[in-house]
Amino acid sequence: MSSRSPDLPGAFLGAPIAHRGLHDRACGVIENSRGAIRAAIEAGYGIEIDIQPAACGEAMVFHDDTLDRLTAETGAVRERSAEALGRIALTASGGETIPTLGEILALVDGRAPLLIEIKDQDGALGPDVGPLGDRIAELLVEYAGPVAVMSFNPAALASLVEAAPRIPRGLITCDFTAEHWPRVPAERRAALAALRDLEPLGAAFISHQWRDLSSPAVLAAKAAGRAVLCWTVRSPREERIARALADNVTFEGYLAEVPEDAPGQSAPSPAPDPRPGGLGWRRRPHRQPAGPRGH
């Protein structure tokens, strides 16, 4: 059993967390891009990003394991070098390319809480996760801002226990149904849904699917003092429901309200529309781009 990781800093429990940054494809601001990160910071939100590995082992800020949905290229992210990925433009972005985690850390620089998801590399939430966690730990050792790391796969976080013990670590969780997780064996799905990896991993928090927050396992985790975040609400109504049990929400598809007393946040300014003469994010509906609706 691992020692419990540090608790989440208070900043993660205040301002809502922008899922993959504050993105809006209609305005050329693509998920997990530098523009989406800047917009989230300027609006006073926390930030969630996703990490996939390059062929060279570098940590790239990108959600999918293939390039097809978000670029004009095809094929696996892990088959390209960081240098090559850094030259690939994100579609409809006006020329933005895929950033590294190091670039995003330098951009955020402690100005917003940063929640990092390590994407599963095993394919079935098993132990074959490769060295991605080691690279992330290496990058975070000297980072001074509020940051936490999480994954659906507990094995993806194992290297951080020793390599980055001061970084809060948590699990992304849900009910793990066979419909949504067909490659994961039934016994493993049951263990994940029951949150049996929390204690062995020493996880300080969970981020749980918002519709399943009343799960007995979630309520037990909360009673044990673990912070409960949730994913991914897409309307004020869903946020209100989720906040009955969750300590904070991860959101997209609308503009969540930032509490005036949100800990660890500077006073938010209106996040600008990046288009010349744009109306500004807060003056119009935030449009949800097409793409996967999972975490």
Segments from the language model and where they lie:
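Phosphate-group recognition and catalysis centered on beta-loop-alpha active-site segments
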Residues: 1-295
